[in-house]
């Protein structure tokens, strides 16, 4: 399973690790993904999603149904 948020599509970021002597090496900054079982009120059922913690905060604020609708995601297919 790839490390991608199922709602926002967030992926790993390519960055640099910089040492004290300023030697730079490539590194991946992974998204903070969590497997969560979320209640979808409109569908009256639980939905298993792999989402970032940032998306979880937005879900708490807006609700799962309206947030998924604003992103153009059909939760019935998940």
Swiss-Prot record:
<dbReference type="Pfam" id="PF00830">
    <property type="entry name" value="Ribosomal_L28"/>
</dbReference>
<dbReference type="GO" id="GO:0003735">
    <property type="term" value="F:structural constituent of ribosome"/>
</dbReference>
<dbReference type="InterPro" id="IPR037147">
    <property type="entry name" value="Ribosomal_bL28_sf"/>
</dbReference>
<dbReference type="GO" id="GO:0006412">
    <property type="term" value="P:translation"/>
</dbReference>
<dbReference type="InterPro" id="IPR001383">
    <property type="entry name" value="Ribosomal_bL28_bact-type"/>
</dbReference>
<comment type="similarity">
    <text>Belongs to the bacterial ribosomal protein bL28 family.</text>
</comment>
<protein>
    <recommendedName>
        <fullName>Large ribosomal subunit protein bL28</fullName>
    </recommendedName>
</protein>
<dbReference type="GO" id="GO:0005840">
    <property type="term" value="C:ribosome"/>
</dbReference>
<dbReference type="InterPro" id="IPR034704">
    <property type="entry name" value="Ribosomal_bL28/bL31-like_sf"/>
</dbReference>
<keyword id="KW-0687">Ribonucleoprotein</keyword>
<keyword id="KW-0689">Ribosomal protein</keyword>
<dbReference type="InterPro" id="IPR026569">
    <property type="entry name" value="Ribosomal_bL28"/>
</dbReference>
<dbReference type="GO" id="GO:1990904">
    <property type="term" value="C:ribonucleoprotein complex"/>
</dbReference>
């Amino acid at each position: 399973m790839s490390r991608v948020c199922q709602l926002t599509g967030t992926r790993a970021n390519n960055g640099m690790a910089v040492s004290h002597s300023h030697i730079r090496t490539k590194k991946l900054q992974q998204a903070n993904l969590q497997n969560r079982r979320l209640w979808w009120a409109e569908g009256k059922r639980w939905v298993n999603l792999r989402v970032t913690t940032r998306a979880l905060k937005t879900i708490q604020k807006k609700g799962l149904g309206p947030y998924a609708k604003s992103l153009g995601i059909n939760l019935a297919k998940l």
